[in-house]
Amino acid sequence: RRINNDCQNFIGNRAMYEKVDWICKDCANIFRQDGLLNNCRSNCFYNTEFLWCIDATENTRNKEQLEQWAAILGAGWN
């Protein structure tokens, strides 16, 4: 299991992290592009690849919730 060191609030939010990370894993499995998984996870999911993967994995109905979870996990980015 890979722990994303970019996510400052991973501890105590493991279930939330796993749901957000699943988007990146699923996207990487679908497209099989080198670096996609790491790019999706970069900056604790605060990036355009993560947003693209939400759409690509047909999770747009959950987009707002996923973005909120990513923001919670990466609180302190700014």
Curated annotation (Swiss-Prot):
Source species: Cancer pagurus
Function in brief: Represses the synthesis of methyl farnesoate, the precursor of insect juvenile hormone III in the mandibular organ.
Matching Pfam families: Crust_neurohorm (PF01147)
Disulfide cross-links: 7-44, 24-40, 27-53
Keywords: Disulfide bond, Hormone, Neuropeptide, Secreted
Organismal lineage: Eukaryota, Metazoa, Ecdysozoa, Arthropoda, Crustacea
First-listed, main subcellular location of the protein, grouped into a coarse class: secreted
Similarity annotation: Belongs to the arthropod CHH/MIH/GIH/VIH hormone family.
Domain of life: Eukaryota
Entry protein name: Mandibular organ-inhibiting hormone 2
One Gene Ontology molecular-function label: neuropeptide hormone activity
InterPro entries linked: Crust_neurhormone_CS, Crust_neurohorm, Crust_neurohorm_sf, Hyperglycemic, Hyperglycemic2
Entry-linked Gene3D superfamilies: Crustacean CHH/MIH/GIH neurohormone
A GO cellular component entry from the record: extracellular region
Localization per Swiss-Prot or TrEMBL: Secreted
Keyword match Lipoprotein: no
Tissues where the protein occurs: Produced by the medulla terminalis X-organ in the eyestalks and transported to the sinus gland where it is stored and released.
Membrane-spanning ranges: none
GO BP terms, alphabetized: circadian rhythm; neuropeptide signaling pathway
